[in-house]
């Protein structure tokens, strides 16, 4: 395989209440696999997938970190539209959805209560809901995954460590600060994806700590301690988009001397 196919495609980069960008979600894409991680808070996910030039018929794996609205409600739309294509004979194979018990139960209940019975009949045959426990290892296409509990006090949430074709390692911390108990699984990763709700200098405006979030400065300090090579910041406020890339990177760089990425919606980043 040509490893240059390995990419992160950020469909959205914002936190829950944003209106000027989409909620944080992304693809991990290889030559053979399009793994969707979270789906934002509504059917805007369909537009983002289309703009990213990804076909729904190529999506066979979805990982949902937790059951908050800005992460799971878009997944209902992805499942619905894939169900529609299955029934129309346009979609080959299965859709595998991975998540903890709360995620899987929530997604299925919303679908059962809102979708046509012909769609819901596909659960267990073509739509496979794969409940995972913390520490479970599994394959999402050609991406090797290990999920872990981020130990949130707010909502049961899983992050993951992924090994891409070619061996690059990527750790996604979900949308909460990295708990020190999870430092071993993230240490030395090639890529760390970490939330940064706002700048530390703007903490009194956006109040990240009251919302169980962190700042760009905090994320940089964690990345430095973990010895990762690349830090990607996401799940931000949307009031400073014009300066976000420069200012967030500058603040994180106070501690972290590796590569820092602060992507916009629909930006693709090579991860080889």
Question: Could you tell me what each predicted segment is?
Answer:
Residues 2-52, 156-175, 191:
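Conserved beta-strand hairpin/beta-sheet module of binuclear metal-dependent hydrolase folds
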Residues 8, 38, 49, 66, ...:
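Divalent metal-coordination and catalytic microenvironments
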Residues 18-20, 129-201:
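Active-site-proximal loop/helix segment associated with metal-binding centers of metalloenzymes
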Residues 36-40, 59-67, 100, 170-176, ...:
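Active-site neighborhood of phospho(di)ester-bond hydrolases with catalytic His/Asp-centered motifs
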Residues 43-96:
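Active-site metal-binding motif and surrounding structural segment of the metallo-beta-lactamase
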Residues 69, 97, 103-104, 236-241:
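Short histidine/acidic/glycine/proline-rich micro-motifs that form metal-
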Residues 91-156, 261, 265:
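Metallo-beta-lactamase
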Residues 177-267:
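Cap/insert and terminal regions of metallo-dependent hydrolase folds
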